[in-house]
Amino acid sequence: MSESNHPVIEFDHVSKIYPNGVVGLKDIDLTINQGEFVVVVGLSGAGKSTLMRAINRLHDISEGDVRIDGVSITKAKGKKLLNIRRKIGMIFQSFNLVNRSSVLKNVLTGRVGYYPTWKMVLGLFSAEDKQRAYDALRTVELEDKVYTRADQLSGGQQQRVAIARALTQTPTIILADEPIASLDPQTTKRVMDDLRRINQEMGITVVANLHSVEVAQAYATRIIGIRAGQKVFDGPVAEATDEIIASIYSGNEQEVS
């Protein structure tokens, strides 16, 4: 599926200042459209993870507004906030799986926002949602691991289970916060290929934080450079020249992400 001009993520003069006075984000204006594959790059502590976590409000911002599909997640509360977050799948560097549970049970937790707590505890998922989980595992080519315990999988397989979990959520957006940081090159390619296929074939908007500029240039349609909490570059991959990349990574930022 191709990109559209429909904005799914909007930052309107967004700033984040931590209680200790450290500036996480400074006056960020940003629009990401449906179907884009955006990679955010910058030094550790530049604010990449802060930006990512502002999208689904894992971090509250200090100023400005963040909108998802035109609706303010900054101002949302209760059920309205839950409904917005249902649209946003999240993949973490640390996988965040329940090691002693099966792959299937882990993937089904992607439906947590659709069930009352007691049904989740008892594992009372509908046949339709179980099919969603199987389909998601098929997408990442792990359908043969349905009943395998998560802690019996390799790191790359665990990250692909995390991708399947995000897919089971039926999101319009997937956020990937350093998804390949602990993976070897071969496994990195597998995970990034999965994300690109999901983006291209399903039309799901992908926003990823990556340390590797080479991987970013290989997979992104657009690169955003963050330095000291500020957006210093935003454009197509072809415009991210060596000089621009060097400027994004210049300086010595304090850890804030």
UniProtKB/Swiss-Prot annotation:
Topology term for the membrane: Peripheral membrane protein
Disulfide bonding pattern of the chain: none
Gene3D superfamilies assigned to the protein according to its UniProt record, in alphabetical order: P-loop containing nucleotide triphosphate hydrolases
Domain ABC transporter stretches: 9-253
Record keyword Cytoplasm present: no
GO molecular-function terms, A-Z: ABC-type phosphonate transporter activity; ATP binding; ATP hydrolysis activity
Keyword terms of this UniProt record: ATP-binding, Cell membrane, Membrane, Nucleotide-binding, Phosphonate transport, Translocase, Transport
Keyword Translocase: yes
SMART domains: AAA (SM00382)
Annotated EC: 7.3.2.2
Binding site for ATP: 42-49
An annotated GO cellular component: plasma membrane
Catalyzed reactions per annotation: phosphonate(out) + ATP + H2O = phosphonate(in) + ADP + phosphate + H(+)
Compartments, as annotated in UniProt: Cell membrane
EC class (word): translocase
InterPro entries (alphabetical): AAA+_ATPase, ABC_transporter-like_ATP-bd, ABC_transporter-like_CS, ABC_transpr_PhnC, MetN_ABC_transporter-like, P-loop_NTPase
Function: Part of the ABC transporter complex PhnCDE involved in phosphonates import. Responsible for energy coupling to the transport system.
Assembly and interaction partners: The complex is composed of two ATP-binding proteins (PhnC), two transmembrane proteins (PhnE) and a solute-binding protein (PhnD).
Protein family: Belongs to the ABC transporter superfamily. Phosphonates importer (TC 3.A.1.9.1) family.
NCBIfam families the UniProt entry points to: ABC_phnC (TIGR02315)
Protein name as it appears in the record: Phosphonates import ATP-binding protein PhnC
